[in-house]
Design a protein with these regions (language model features):
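Residue-level recognition of beta-strand->loop/alpha-helix junctions
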Residues: 1, 74-76, 125
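Glycine-rich phosphate-binding loop used to anchor ATP phosphates in small-molecule kinases
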Residues: 22-76
C-alpha cells in the first residue's frame, strides 16, 4: 500500500488535505472491491495524525457493505527496536518516517492515535516476528483465503 501513498505524494505533500483524501478513497475502495470479490486482505497502517480517527469505522462499513468481515490486528514494536530501525535505508523505499528526532517528537501523538483504534483480535510483536511470518500467522489464525 505504500506505493499508493507514494503515488499520491508525487502530486500532493504527505499529510495535506488532498493527500489524505485521495489515499483514504483508494484504501476504502480497495477494501470494498476486495470484499465484494471474496478476497482476504491483510492491510497495515500506522495510526497517526494523517489517518482520520474514524477511519477504522469507515473501513469496517466499506467491507461489511460488500458482505465481508474486518478483523483488527495490532502490530507492536518496542521503543528501543523502533529507534534502532528508524534510519534503515529500506524505510525510504516505502516513504516511511526516518528521523529519530521527529519520531521522538511525534511519539505522544502516535500513542494517542493508537489508543483510538478498535480493540485487536490478535497482537503481534514485530520485533520478534518477521513480516512474512506475521502475515502467515494472521492468515492461519483467521482462516483467510485468497478467494
Amino acid at each position: 500500500m505504500a506505493a499508493i501513498g507514494g503515488a499520491v505524494a508525487a502530486v500532493f505533500p504527505f499529510g495535506s488535505e488532498r493527500f489524505v483524501k485521495l489515499r483514504e478513497q483508494f484504501w476504502l475502495a480497495m477494501f470494498h472491491e476486495a470484499a465484494e470479490a471474496g478476497h482476504s486482505v491483510i492491510f497495515t497502517f500506522a495510526p497517526e495524525a494523517s489517518v482520520a480517527p474514524d477511519f477504522p469505522d469507515r473501513a469496517r462499513q466499506a467491507v461489511e457493505a460488500a458482505g465481508g468481515e474486518i478483523i483488527f490486528v495490532r502490530l507492536t514494536l518496542s521503543r528501543d527496536e523502533q529507534e534502532r530501525r528508524i534510519g534503515n535505508p529500506d524505510r525510504a523505499v516505502f516513504g516511511k518516517l526516518r528521523s529519530l528526532e521527529l519520531l521522538r517528537q511525534l511519539r505522544d501523538q502516535f500513542m494517542a492515535s493508537e489508543a483510538a483504534m478498535p480493540p485487536a483480535a490478535l497482537t503481534i510483536d514485530t520485533g520478534t516476528t518477521k513480516p512474512t511470518a506475521a502475515s502467515r500467522l494472521i492468515a492461519d489464525r483467521f482462516n483467510l483465503t485468497r478467494g
